[in-house]
Curated annotation (Swiss-Prot):
Name by which UniProt lists this protein: Uncharacterized protein MJ0642
Ranges for domain Fe/B12 periplasmic-binding: 45-318
Domain of life the protein comes from: Archaea
Matches recorded under SUPFAM superfamilies: Helical backbone' metal receptor (SSF53807)
Organism name: Methanocaldococcus jannaschii (strain ATCC 43067 / DSM 2661 / JAL-1 / JCM 10045 / NBRC 100440) (Methanococcus jannaschii)
Amino acid sequence: MITMALNFYKYYSRQIKYALHFNILNNSIIDAENKYINFQKPLKNVIVSDSMFIDTAYLLKIKKMIKSIKGVFWADFVLKKYYPLYSDYLKGKISNVGTDGKINYGEILNINPDMIFLIDWNIFNPLSKWLDKNNIPYTKTGNYKEPKFLGKMEWIKFYASFYNKYKKAEKVFNKIIEEKRRILKSLNSRSIKYKPVVAFFGYHKNQPYIYGKSHYIPNWIREIKGNYLFENVEGTNYHYIDRKIFNSRAKYADVCILDTMGEDIDIKELLKNNPHFLKFRAYKNKRFYITTKDYLKFETLKCSEVMEEYVKIIHPKIYQNGDNDLKYFIKVV
């Protein structure tokens, strides 16, 4: 079961360098709710709501971790990005245990999981209470609210630790740290006289939303000498914003990046449904981008490459090919 951690342990003999929302102390794992997680190793049956768990399994090539996945929330959407997991899902080897507001409690009992990995969203609070009542072990994850790119990436240590692969995760993570240093060293060796204004945002049901200035993407934008447009928005979470207010500000941004959140966006349809984009400075100057449908998983699988592509987008002139060889973003025009 899960027991509450004492706060002072969070800062004692800390093994985690960048992440703020989990810790590992003397082989003990502390999750996003500051709770010690006790479990039987190795895990053979797990249920996941956090796709970064799956990304970590593939990044570190932990076969036992992949094999242990027996249930996934939003499986129809999440597993399409992963093969052969999606094939296993279609064959009935992996179950869809729930979507927004609809939890398949019976299937959770059938799986009899050794651990459930839940994102620490409010929608999972009723499920958490039910799991406590039924003595089913679970842990809460919060990589999405880390204020630093490397903080989010460091969560690979959290997931890997459940499979005795902490050292493997640490080795991979340390290489990413070195890559980040290389990126910044190269950038800082150039004379950057102007810091472009960047609008990083999303759209859901034709409603724009923006991220707080402490989110890891705005922080990275600042670190690579860009100015985040929505500096007045606090926190790490996203916030819906009135369309007129959004348009009045975003139209003057030098760079626009639309986070598609895994959707396969048709650019012609996007511009047809949002003709105001055509009036944006970023569109007129051919600096309007959208993320690819698989972008989110590549934040983990190809972290350093994704970080560098932000530099290419914000400062294309310092690269020989500019922003013409992007893998994880698509130029709208």
